[in-house]
Amino acid sequence: MGSELETAMETLINVFHAHSGKEGDKYKLSKKELKELLQTELSGFLDAQKDADAVDKVMKELDENGDGEVDFQEYVVLVAALTVACNNFFWENS
């Protein structure tokens, strides 16, 4: 068994690939796949967003190369940004 960090990294990879490739490129998330990932894995994030267009905005911000899909590198940017934003909350409540 790996360290906590190795396990966390493996989980991030597995979550991405569990949602990618259901339609189109198996190494990227379509808008529909990104929405499904956010709804199942980050439902608290979506619940906190009062904006009905939250997924569209997230997709636009993440899709750095403008191909209409989110690749693994772009997905990691989302996870890292959310982790930074949540750091104080989790640290203070642990």
Curated annotation (Swiss-Prot):
Domain of life: Eukaryota
Blocked amino end (Gly) modifications at: 2
Cellular component, GO annotation: cytoplasm; cytosol; Golgi apparatus; mitochondrion; nucleoplasm; sarcoplasmic reticulum
Principal location class: cytoplasm
GO terms, biological process: positive regulation of sprouting angiogenesis; regulation of heart contraction
Residues reported to bind Ca(2+) 1: 28, 33
SUPFAM superfamilies the UniProt entry points to: EF-hand
Keyword terms, alphabetized: Calcium, Cytoplasm, Metal-binding, Mitochondrion, Repeat, S-nitrosylation, Sarcoplasmic reticulum
GO molecular function, one term: calcium-dependent protein binding
Disulphide bonds in the chain: none
Post-translational modification: Glutathionylated; glutathionylation increases affinity to calcium about 10-fold.
Expression sites by tissue: Although predominant among the water-soluble brain proteins, S100 is also found in a variety of other tissues.
Positions contributing to Ca(2+) 2 binding: 63, 65, 67, 69, 74
InterPro entries per UniProt: EF-hand-dom_pair (IPR011992), EF_Hand_1_Ca_BS (IPR018247), EF_hand_dom (IPR002048), S100-A1 (IPR028486), S100/CaBP7/8-like_CS (IPR001751), S100_Ca-bd_sub (IPR013787)
Subcellular location: Cytoplasm; Sarcoplasmic reticulum; Mitochondrion
Record-linked Pfam families: EF-hand_1 (PF00036), S_100 (PF01023)
Function: Small calcium binding protein that plays important roles in several biological processes such as Ca(2+) homeostasis, chondrocyte biology and cardiomyocyte regulation. In response to an increase in intracellular Ca(2+) levels, binds calcium which triggers conformational changes. These changes allow interactions with specific target proteins and modulate their activity.
Oligomeric form and interacting partners: Dimer of either two alpha chains, or two beta chains, or one alpha and one beta chain. Also forms heterodimers with S100P. Interacts with AGER. Interacts with CAPZA1. Interacts with FKBP4. Interacts with RYR1 and RYR2. Interacts with CACYBP in a calcium-dependent manner. Interacts with PPP5C (via TPR repeats); the interaction is calcium-dependent and modulates PPP5C activity. Interacts with ATP2A2 and PLN in a Ca(2+)-dependent manner. Interacts with mitochondrial F1-ATPase subunits ATP5F1A and ATP5F1B; these interactions increase F1-ATPase activity.
Entries under PANTHER family matching the protein: PROTEIN S100-A1-RELATED, S100 CALCIUM-BINDING PROTEIN
Extra remark beyond the main annotation: Able to bind zinc in vitro; the binding sites are different from the calcium binding sites. The physiological relevance of zinc binding is unclear. Physiological concentrations of potassium antagonize the binding of both divalent cations, especially affecting the high-affinity calcium-binding sites.
Name listed for the protein in its UniProt record: Protein S100-A1
Organism field: Bos taurus
